[in-house]
Amino acid sequence: MQEIDVRGLPPPEPFLNINAALQSLEASETLKVLIHREPYPLYDILRDTGYTWQTTALADGNYEILIVRNQ
């Protein structure tokens, strides 16, 4: 599982870093993202490009997103 931490980065850096990491995922591989806010625009892109994800709100106010490339 790959992991990236984009907490605290100003826009558009979180999206750019997540997108770059997604490009290197193999089918069925998971990317774990730590981010300081819930990235709603990212969800539309993930849905449209064949990824599934699970978002968990963490006790410290951050979010953990597990993203899987479907094929």
Each PLM stretch: what is its role?
Residues 1, 28-32, 62-64:
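Intrinsic-disorder/low-complexity, polar/charged segments enriched in Ser/Thr/Lys/Arg/Asp/Glu/Gln
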Residues 1-25:
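An N-terminal amphipathic alpha-helical segment
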Residues 5, 34, 66-68:
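Generic structural detector for well-ordered beta-strands
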Residues 24-27, 48:
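Secondary-structure boundary motif
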Residues 50-71:
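C-terminal edge-of-domain segments
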